[in-house]
Each structure stands twice: as structure tokens, then as C-alpha cells.
């Protein structure tokens, strides 16, 4: 996204409200939902999202490394979401949430340049013993995806081979 687009959006968004107002939490917490076709801000090629969860012990240095890598790649994210997950273990066989910090970032898709960035971010996540959110992933390595799903083999016992998806084809690749 061009810097002037981000500046214009931020200026318009923050000027729209005058004074204090009471409002429902939904539009406050999901501001992009109020903008029709917001995904077009990323251009014709769209965007990819990278979301990871980092264990508490490695979260801070890994976050610094992720942000440093993004800066060195001269990239930025129009939308960033940082949350701390609680201490409950994953409940489902393919659950993403687990104790730690999660960071979600949107990047305009720029072909090989974006693929290299995601590969570099994934290396940091793997080194930190983190995980990738498969439901939001389009570019991560199959091995890291498998590591992100520690109960995948248990889930496979219930899988119907007649059903398939891009995620499953990627997970089965290079096995």
C-alpha cells in the first residue's frame, strides 16, 4: 500500500468521530468491516496474511526479530493485531490458540518478494518454537504447518479421503 493511502485512510478514519460517543463494540473492534471492499487497498494482487503464535519464553525476542525482518524487507502491514493468549492448552485436534503471544499481519502480495518475506518470518517462528495459523496461511512451508499442528496425525484418523483442500494438499506434499 502506498504511504499516502495509509495516511489518507488514517486521517479520514480518525476525523470521522467528533468528541466522545457511545457505540457498540463491534464496529469499534472491527473498523475495516465498515469500509466496503477494504481489501482493494492492497491493489490488484490482493494480500496475504501471516499469523503466528509464539511461546511466552521466546515471544519478546521473536517479535523483535519478526518486526526487524519486516523493516529490513522494506515492507509494512496496513493492519497488525497483537494478542496474548491465555494459559489453556489447545482444545481441538487442529486448534491454533495456545499459551503465548499471537501476531497477525497483512502484506500486499508482490510475488517472489512476498514469498521470501513469509519464508524469512516462518524461519523466525520455527526458531522460536512457535506455530503458524493454517486457516490464514497461503505461503508457509508444509513442514512448519505440520509442526504447527501437533495433533495432526490424531486428526488424520478421522479424515475422509474423498474430501480435499489446498491446505491438505500442502500438508501431504513432501511427506
Segments (PLM) and residue ranges:
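Noncatalytic alpha-helical scaffold of FAD-dependent oxidoreductases
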Residues: 1-175
Amino acid at each position: 500500500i502506498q504511504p499516502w493511502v495509509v495516511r489518507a485512510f488514517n486521517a479520514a478514519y480518525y476525523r470521522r468521530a467528533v468528541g466522545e460517543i457511545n457505540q457498540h463494540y463491534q464496529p469499534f473492534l472491527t473498523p475495516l468491516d465498515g469500509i466496503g471492499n477494504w481489501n482493494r487497498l492492497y491493489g490488484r494482487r490482493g494480500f496475504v496474511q501471516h499469523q503466528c503464535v509464539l511461546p511466552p519464553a521466546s515471544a519478546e525476542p521473536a517479535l523483535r526479530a519478526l518486526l526487524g525482518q519486516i523493516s529490513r524487507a522494506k515492507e509494512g502491514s496496513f493492519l497488525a493485531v497483537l494478542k496474548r493468549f491465555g494459559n489453556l492448552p489447545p482444545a481441538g485436534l487442529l486448534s491454533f490458540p495456545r499459551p503465548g503471544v499471537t501476531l497477525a499481519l497483512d502484506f500486499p502480495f508482490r510475488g517472489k518478494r512476498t514469498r521470501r518475506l513469509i519464508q524469512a518470518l516462518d524461519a523466525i517462528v520455527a526458531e522460536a518454537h512457535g506455530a503458524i495459523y493454517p486457516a490464514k496461511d497461503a505461503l508457509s512451508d508444509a513442514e512448519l504447518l505440520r509442526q504447527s499442528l501437533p495433533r495432526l496425525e490424531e486428526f488424520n484418523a478421522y479424515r475422509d479421503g474423498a474430501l480435499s483442500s489446498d491446505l491438505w494438499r500442502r500438508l501431504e506434499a513432501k511427506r
